[in-house]
Amino acid sequence: MHKLFILTGPTASGKSEVSKIVAERLGCTIINCDSKQIYQHVPTITDQAEYLRTNPQFGLYGYVHPSNSYSVGLWLEDAKREILLAWEKKSPAIVVGGSGLYISSLIYGLSEIPPADAHIRQKARALLSEVGNDTFFELLLRRDANVCKIDRRNSNQLLRAFEVFESTGVSIFSWRERCPKKRPFENCEVCVLFPPKEELHPKINSRLVDMINSSAVAEVEYLMSLNLPADAPIMKAIGVREVIEYLRGNISLPEAVEAAQRNTRQYAKRQYTWLRRQLPQDAQFLPTREEMVQHLVSRLTETEK
């Protein structure tokens, strides 16, 4: 039986660099599991190095237009296809990224809830944009008391709950009970690159400086030209909100960098918590890139024997 390897970890921990080294040594296939690195035309703000977009060993990087509607369900179907293609070619597959919802769907599966029509999705986005998260949450709570389980700051979960109720008249939580999850792959090994926070923070800070000194501002200008809704997934990429504030003249560029660094450190903190609590008990946590490379090369070599 094939074994699927999943490499995850907080932002800026070095997952892409590890995957590049392992791919070069073993010729394996790398499949993206970062919900922002799927997007085209914005490589700087999504931290897509050129090899991620051009090397045929790397899949699901930079292939979705920023204005296109895309979901975890669509990603999971794309990922399953890429994984099976790799195995058909006798290539080990490693899924790499830090997006919790994508990782969870791959490990535990998704409930088969009916998709919402496009006009209902539009209606939900327009309402959220008009009233904001708090009011949207309260409106939804009146329809479905179980919505109290959702973090009102999580726009994606609020929108999905609204869409499901509006489309079917049934709570998304009831659908999940009716349609239990089915694991896409039974044989998964999860590896977590988990550096100490005090080592990660300087890397986050320097990454944001490098982004701004590169083409991040131009990429955000491009996104603004598309007139995307504020809650579009790509508009939540690291640094986008802060650069928009700079471009609108509300803050200086150094203030935008400082705010992006602070917000990214807070995001990494949430990732640390999620990774500790939501992954299988046998997930392998390692603190350094070197240890992770050695571990993956060893495990992949053993598995392929």
UniProtKB/Swiss-Prot annotation:
Per the UniProt record, the site (Interaction with substrate tRNA) maps to: 99, 121
* HAMAP family with a match to the protein in the record: IPP_trans
Q: What does this protein do?
A: Catalyzes the transfer of a dimethylallyl group onto the adenine at position 37 in tRNAs that read codons beginning with uridine, leading to the formation of N6-(dimethylallyl)adenosine (i(6)A).
Which keywords does UniProt give here? ATP-binding, Magnesium, Nucleotide-binding, Transferase, tRNA processing
> Which GO MF term does the entry hold, naming one?
ATP binding
**Reactions catalysed, as given in the entry:** adenosine(37) in tRNA + dimethylallyl diphosphate = N(6)-dimethylallyladenosine(37) in tRNA + diphosphate
Name the positions where substrate binds.
Answer: 11-16
Q: What protein family does this chain belong to?
A: Belongs to the IPP transferase family.
**What is the protein's quaternary organization?**
Monomer.
For this protein, the record's PANTHER family field holds:
TRNA DIMETHYLALLYLTRANSFERASE
Q: What is this protein called?
A: tRNA dimethylallyltransferase
Which NCBIfam families does the record cross-reference, listed alphabetically? miaA
One GO BP annotation is: tRNA modification
Q: Which InterPro entries match?
A: Dimethylallyltransferase, IPT, P-loop_NTPase
List the residue ranges of the region (Interaction with substrate tRNA). 34-37
Q: Which residues bind ATP?
A: 9-16
Q: Which cofactor does it need?
A: Mg(2+)
Q: What is its EC number?
A: 2.5.1.75
